[in-house]
Amino acid sequence: MKSFKIGDLTVKLPIIQGGMGVGISLSGLASAVANEGGVGVISCAGIGLLYPRFSKDYLTNSMMGLREELRKARAKTRGIVGVNVMVALSNFSDMVRTAISEKADIIFSGAGLPLDLPSYLREDSTTKLVPIVSSARAAR
């Protein structure tokens, strides 16, 4: 199989693991896929439900949970790890900011048109942005 590039990242195998929530696409699966040469993906959907120990606030738990999952994945792989953040999430902005601050390699974003996604990146950000486009109309 041929490798492919996303920006300056080279993906050895043309496999991108889907972001499956709630609690399926976490650090274990993402790091395993990344270790095999694909792109491992952590899903943000419902991640705050898995981390109630941080706070009584779901939004805080979501950000802290994503932070922890990214750090756990990084400890298990040197491969490419991304995050799936649905635009439809009420905490979309917070999750995007968290993924960028934790230096996720890629943010995949669908379930809506993420037109403002590039505005979250700073000049020194290395995170790649990959919109999930569901139709030809949306691509236009």
Give each language-model segment a name:
Residues 1-140:
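Active-site entrance/lid segments in N-terminal catalytic domains of soluble metabolic enzymes
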